[in-house]
Amino acid sequence: MASDNGSNIMASIDEMMYSVGVETLHPGGLEKTMEMAEACKIIHGSKVLDIGNGKGFTAIRLAQKYGCTVVGVDMSKAMTDYAKMSAETKGLSQQINFMNIDAHQLPFGDNTFDVVFAECSTVLMDKEKAFKEFVRVTKSGGYVADLEMCWRKPPDRKTVDRAFEIWEGFSTMTFEEWRDFFAEMGLTEIRLNDFSDKLRNMTTLYIKALGVMGILKISWRMLKNKSLRKAMLEYDKFFNNNKEYIGYGYFVGRKE
């Protein structure tokens, strides 16, 4: 089991990033999110399931751009409540429904959604159990898509253990293993997009996402909060020390 210190590292950083207006917390940002959406052929009227919806930014973007309907699911009630308020504020509450449920046991019938869309969530889940549910609720001819941190090559045990500690329960695979996993789940026409080079300098990515005002706000919060400052340093240290292993990419597969 992860230590309290380790398990709180990402929670502290995520909360801080959201508080200063960062909408997507993965390298590649909104660009890769929407690129993955295009690969899923989302159109007006599509029915999309957003796994681990967080504060609802992806679901809202998809609904706004495509005119699709979205159901978002998340284990966090706080995130679910925030997402609901965001959708209501933007006049999208009739188009988007956020639910506080476990994605391992989806309360939807078979063949319900045109697209099942996940970002940075299944690495914290029982992947086989979760994907069986994702595929089950996807319509024939529909798509399952997932954007995750992946191993560029098999890591050593120390790296695996530290990743598990930082992201409590974290478990990922190499790009090749992810592609094989999609195939094992019965998906075809599997598309892989490896954008690991986006990770070359995490500090630069943060600066670009935050902007001047965001940087000032975060600097002030870190000056006042020693534990938050420590968490940020631990996170940055892990990425900088393991660049040879850490990658990011997305996978899209079609259900026959």
Regions found by a protein language model. Give the residues of each.
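Short alpha-helix
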Residues: 171-186
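Short, glycine-/aromatic-enriched active-site segment of Class I SAM-dependent methyltransferases
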Residues: 149-169
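Conserved alpha-helix/loop element of class I SAM-dependent methyltransferases that forms part
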Residues: 26-44
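Conserved Class I S-adenosyl-L-methionine
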Residues: 193-256
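Class I SAM-dependent methyltransferase SAM/SAH-binding core
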Residues: 49-51, 55-105
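A short glycine-rich, Lys/Arg-flanked "PGG" loop and its adjoining helix->strand segment in the class I
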Residues: 128-143
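A short SAM/SAH-binding and catalytic strip from SAM-dependent methyltransferases
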Residues: 115-126
